[in-house]
UniProtKB/Swiss-Prot annotation:
The protein's name in its UniProt record: Anamorsin homolog
Motif Cx2C motif 2, residue numbers: 249-252
Cofactor(s) this protein cannot do without: [2Fe-2S] cluster; [4Fe-4S] cluster
InterPro entries named in the record: Anamorsin (IPR007785), CIAPIN1 (IPR046408)
UniProt subcellular location: Cytoplasm; Mitochondrion intermembrane space
Lineage: Eukaryota, Sar, Stramenopiles, Ochrophyta, Bacillariophyta
């Protein structure tokens, strides 16, 4: 069984002859300490990392553990020993233990792909964290659990065509024109002769039209013959009958009627109240 012991920072101790001791005096040297040692070329069954409590915040690198794990054999154990001083310096380190970030060690296990197994504490404030590297079978089962499921069926390719119009409902253009499909009704028939006859009677001018049917021609003929003139029978001395109520006198026969043009008195007199 081969093993290695890594001493970080100011930690010093004696080990047995079967263990390779590697020094990592600085935080930066932790990731390369094993690769720089020729005696650790073969995979190790166990790696023990020792560090004093006072050096943990400044000398332990959570990312460096990932560079050490490749030297560990599958199923091998890695332990981090955080040692507290046992002599007169214990009183000085006891205060430092309370502010130590212990999660840095467990975080380094996760980043290195190790499975944490145990955490032990001693009476002096030290702790030992143990983790194990996965075996080849465990790595394969983990990859299979997270991989895609293959049902073994033959792969089929689906082809889509943009010219596939089998599902389109086509409409006959002739049905839109003749109304056979019930979508458009034929336009109504216009009686052009009736429209022409109605347009012949147009008394909008100063005189009645030749084909007058509204009675204006008869009225004009009676006026020209000296017959009863409704305009002459209804008038006032003010002479403002055609201008509207604002200009009419109190005895004007056209009070309450709209203004009119000279010569159109007969049209105003024929207006009937709708109320």
């Amino acid at each position: 069984m081969t093993s290695a012991s890594i001493h970080i920072g100011s930690y010093t101790s004696t080990t047995n002859g079967n263990t390779t001791v590697v020094k990592a005096p600085t935080k930066e040297s932790l990731s390369t300490c094993l690769s720089a040692t020729a005696t650790t070329t073969s995979p190790l069954d166990s790696i023990d990392i020792y560090i004093n409590t006072s050096d943990l915040p400044t000398h332990y690198d959570s990312l460096a553990l990932a560079s050490i794990v490749p030297s560990l054999s599958p199923g091998g154990v890695l332990s981090v020993h955080v040692v507290s001083a046992s002599s007169s310096a214990a009183s000085n380190e006891s205060a430092a233990v309370d502010v130590v970030n212990w999660s840095a060690i467990t975080t380094s296990f996760v980043l290195a792909g190790l499975k944490a197994e145990s955490e032990q504490r001693d009476g002096s404030g030290g702790r030992v964290y143990t983790a194990r590297k996965a075996t080849a079978s465990q790595s394969a089962s983990s990859a299979a659990a997270t991989g895609r499921i293959n049902l073994g069926g033959a792969k089929t390719k689906v082809k889509l065509s943009l010219d596939d119009d089998d599902d389109d409902q086509l409409i006959d253009e002739d049905d839109l024109l003749n109304g056979g499909g019930g979508m458009l009704a034929p336009p109504p028939t216009i009686d052009t002769e009736a429209r022409a006859k109605s347009n012949l009677d147009d008394c909008g001018g100063r005189k009645a039209c030749d084909n007058c049917t509204c009675g204006r021609a008869e009225q004009e003929a009676a006026d020209a013959a000296g017959g009863p003139n409704e305009q002459q029978s209804k008038s006032s001395a003010c002479g403002n009958c055609a201008k509207g109520d604002a200009f009419r006198c109190a005895g004007c026969p056209y009070l309450g009627m709209p203004a009119f043009k000279e010569g159109e008195e007969h049209l105003v007199l024929k207006l009937n109240d709708d109320v």
